[in-house]
């Protein structure tokens, strides 16, 4: 039982010189002393480290977990390159860019499709703004044409093995095969994966210190908030090798259904990010995928100056090639210089020194 003064009885009286004294309330003083004692005890006698569930044997044959060798790295497929070192100390992401291209079936006896000028400019943007140690070009059928001849010396070509299935589920469409192949490249090699219609507008350096980074793709439904996107778009993937998030993403293909478009390439990674938020760094739709593809956004990007890519601070622009082909297929060095619009202003720095001469020769052949 507490003494009377601690139970709200007499207050504490502290005598002072010259017959003065201070009267203090008893209970607060007691609580203060107890709190101080608890704090000092915690500082000088920290709690022991947590023990694993159960109790280790006292047997002399016990091998402590601290003595275990590091686990071996996963078996890397021969068609995926070894991870490169990151660009700077502290970065986690290897200094490499990956493209996956040419998986679309080609009739026997035919060559690959001609690389379009807009794709050449996109790869030039990565070369100029990312300055990677290597640009890996994973392919089944190599492209052809003058723009390919210009960009090819800057690429490391990798003849790939196209996955036909995953976890026993068939991959019938070449786009789904490309989805899986890019994840395999990120798992075993790491770096920055880019779709062929991604224009890099500034360096990614500040994004390379986190194991995995993805960007939101906004929903075309205006009733949904910015934090309720369509998903996380796989047109840009930034990752270290063997990241937990990429492993989860690949494992999710156990439920793959080729009849549901974009389910595992956009919707599923957002679901995984919400379930495991510390495993992936998520950027808003304004980082990579803005302006969007719906409504008049593509038209505004190619016909007006409404959007300023430099002032926006965004890292890249996804050109939505399948929907913007009417604009992209007509690009030329001259049209980019002469026509004032948001897209042309953004891509002008990527025009190469031989583009005008090459375009004239190409045009004569068409």
Curated annotation (Swiss-Prot):
Gene inactivation effect: Leads to an absence of beta-1,3-glucan and a strong decrease in alpha-1,4-glucan from the cell wall, a decrease in intracellular glycogen at 37 degrees Celsius, cell wall organization defects, and scattering of glycogen rosettes throughout the cytosol. Decreases survival in macrophage-like cells and leads to a decreased fungal burden in the mouse lung following intranasal inoculation. Simultaneous knockout of GLG1 exacerbates the glycogen synthesis and virulence defect.
Record GO cellular component, one term: plasma membrane
Extracellular compartment residues: 1-24
Membrane topology of the entry: Single-pass membrane protein
Transmembrane segments: 25-45
UniProtKB keywords: Cell membrane, Cell wall biogenesis/degradation, Glycogen biosynthesis, Membrane, Transmembrane, Transmembrane helix
Database matches in InterPro entries: GlycoTrfase_DXD_sugar-bd_CS (IPR007577), Nucleotide-diphossugar_trans (IPR029044)
Primary site of residence: membrane
An example Gene Ontology biological process: glycogen biosynthetic process
UniProt-annotated location(s): Cell membrane
UniProt cross-references to SUPFAM superfamilies, sorted A to Z: Nucleotide-diphospho-sugar transferases
Topological domains, Cytoplasmic: 46-366
Biological role stated in the UniProt entry: Plays a role in the localization of glycogen rosettes to the plasma membrane. Required for correct cell wall organization and may facilitate the connection between beta-1,3-glucan and beta-1,6-glucan in the cell wall.
PANTHER family hit by this protein: ALPHA-1,4-N-ACETYLGLUCOSAMINYLTRANSFERASE, TRANSFERASE, PUTATIVE-RELATED
Family assignment from sequence similarity: Belongs to the glycosyltransferase 32 family.
Protein name: Glucan organizing enzyme 1
Organism in which the protein naturally occurs: Cryptococcus neoformans var. grubii serotype A (strain H99 / ATCC 208821 / CBS 10515 / FGSC 9487)
């Amino acid at each position: 039982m507490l003494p009377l003064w601690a139970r709200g009885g007499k207050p504490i009286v502290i005598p002072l010189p010259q017959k003065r004294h201070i009267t203090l309330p008893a209970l607060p003083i007691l609580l203060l002393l107890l709190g101080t004692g608890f704090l000092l005890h915690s500082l000088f006698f920290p709690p022991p480290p947590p023990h694993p569930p159960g109790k280790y044997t006292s047997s002399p044959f016990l091998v402590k977990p601290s003595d275990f060798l590091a686990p071996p790295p996963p078996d890397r497929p021969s068609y995926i390159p070894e991870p490169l070192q990151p660009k700077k100390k502290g970065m986690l992401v290897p200094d490499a860019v990956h493209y996956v291209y040419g998986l679309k079936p080609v009739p026997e006896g035919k060559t690959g499709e001609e690389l379009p000028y807009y794709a050449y400019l996109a790869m030039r943007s990565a070369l100029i703004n990312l300055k990677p140690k290597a640009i890996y070009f994973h392919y089944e059928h190599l492209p052809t044409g003058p723009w390919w001849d210009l960009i090819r010396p800057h690429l490391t070509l990798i003849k790939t093995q196209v996955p036909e299935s995953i976890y026993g589920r068939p991959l019938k469409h070449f786009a789904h095969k490309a989805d899986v192949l890019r994840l395999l490249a990120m798992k075993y090699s790491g770096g920055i994966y880019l779709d062929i219609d991604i224009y890099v507008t500034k360096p990614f350096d500040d994004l390379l210190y986190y194991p995995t980074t993805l960007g939101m793709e906004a929903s075309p439904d205006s009733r949904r908030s910015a934090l309720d996107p369509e998903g996380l778009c796989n047109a840009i993937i930034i990752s270290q090798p063997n990241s937990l998030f990429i492993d989860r993403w690949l494992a999710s293909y156990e439920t793959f259904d080729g009849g549901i478009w974009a389910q595992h390439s956009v919707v599923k990674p957002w679901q995984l990010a919400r379930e495991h938020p510390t495993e992936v760094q998520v950027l808003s739709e304004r980082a990579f995928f803005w302006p969007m593809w719906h409504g008049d956004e593509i038209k505004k990007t190619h016909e007006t100056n409404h959007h300023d890519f430099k002032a926006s601070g965004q890292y890249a622009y996804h050109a939505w090639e399948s929907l913007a082909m009417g604009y992209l297929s007509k690009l030329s060095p001259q049209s980019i210089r002469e026509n004032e619009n948001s897209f042309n202003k953004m891509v002008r720095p990527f025009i190469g020194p031989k583009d005008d001469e090459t375009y004239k020769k190409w045009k004569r052949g068409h």
